[in-house]
Amino acid sequence: MKGAIIGDIAGSIYEFDETEESLDFPLFVKNSRFTDDTVTTVAVAAALMEGKASCCGYIEPLRRQLRYWCRKYPDAGFGGLFRCWFLADEAPAYGSYGNGAAMRVSPAGWIADTLEEAQALAELTAVVSHDHPQAIKGAIAVASAIFLARQGKEKEAIAAYLRSHFYDLSRTLAQIRPSYGFTCTTDDSVPEAIECFMEGTDYEDTIRKAIWLNGDTDTQAAIAGSIAEAYYGVPDALWQQALPYVGDEEMKGVIRQFYENYIGSRGNSFDFNRDKQEI
């Protein structure tokens, strides 16, 4: 979750502003900010914690928490159709195939006890607004990668699973970047974000690669960063740099509670002895 938030903040200033060929660019500057990626991720975390604790289902908390948090931060950079959705007290999902479901799904990968649960929760977090098959697939793919990384699976095993069930993942970043540009469609942004994780050497390198790709910089850094967190962990020094850009105490409280309940409590030190078994 922190991995998604840091990626979002770091990528926020580079959207539509091509980075240099080098990966050596500042991650945090005066104009950096959290965007809709962070707001909706926090909303999903709050909803899943509520649903897990109450055993009364997740759909109603997801709708309510997304509307609450998005209305609280209405200028965070939401798309027009999603804005109409969260401003309406009652509105159905609207068939979006955008990457909004994948960018907010990371809590599902952490809160789940099994891969099947992670995938089921990911679908629920998507369908309340983004019910197109592309959007659902993207959310499930990202949550699956997070869960498998949490379990200590090697990148090769994670990639093999994702190729088998979701995306081709045959193009390298060097092949993607020359002709790549901004897109927020799931099928044209989520596989590329996953590839940033696959080629990243640590958490920071992963989000730098996602920004360097020159696509949907904040969202792709959030997606790649969410997977990289589960694999590498997030350096505390980097989180401390990002923290001043995070919202108010209520937002920070949800993040803190989620880590206390579902990440720190599971003893994830990120010093994994990774197995190399097939998934």
Model-inferred region functions:
Residues 1-279:
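Structured, active/binding-site neighborhoods that engage oxygen-rich ligands
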